[in-house]
């Protein structure tokens, strides 16, 4: 239980830092996600090549690539929530992933629902509902944040099975590659709908 709480606090801290940088970067949420996953893909693949000399990918790794797609869309909605609202709203909505995980994990893993976890995580839902009703300017950001937390709950639940293989670096690298390809395929259509969209980061964006 203590380890779970430590992991939760660490995840919230990382989400806060990521949210702050995402808010400071002038790029669109889709581009932020694309560049982030591309950079992570290159670094992790290089690490694997240096360590093992080669990377073996077979048909059994396809589901790992699809998990990367799921993670990519989670980040797009997370950064979208921050852009449309603010960092605080984005992070609070991210905390809602605990509520969704308490529902999704028993369903996927065929286990009993932990009513204690569900009750504790529902407190976040109560806080979000207060913000939603009292500040209409944040509603789009809250909706995007809720979708983001739902996607992350699915990702976290499915990723538990994948990480049991023990090849964490390879798994993460393949997920980053899958997410990068997904954003790459989406970007041409997205760019057409937003012709004024800047594709290249500024020097200030590179700092963050």
Residue ranges and their predicted role:
Residues 1-34, 69, 73, 77, ...:
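Glycine-/small-residue-enriched transmembrane alpha-helix faces in small-molecule transporters
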Residues 3-7, 31-46, 117-123, 163-208:
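Hydrophobic alpha-helical transmembrane segments of multi-pass integral membrane proteins
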Residues 8, 32-33, 64, 87-91, ...:
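Alpha-helical transmembrane segments and their helix-entry boundary regions
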Residues 26, 84, 110-112, 165:
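Helix-loop interface residues and adjacent transmembrane-helix termini in multi-pass membrane transporters
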Residues 31, 38-42, 70, 79-110, ...:
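Specific alpha-helical transmembrane segments that line the substrate/conduction pathway
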Residues 44, 48, 96, 103, ...:
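Hydrophobic transmembrane alpha-helices of multi-pass small-molecule transport proteins
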Residues 51-89, 94, 130:
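Specific transmembrane alpha-helical segments of multi-pass solute transporters/efflux pumps
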Residues 79-85, 131-141, 193, 197-198:
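Membrane-interface helix caps and helix-loop-helix hairpins in membrane proteins
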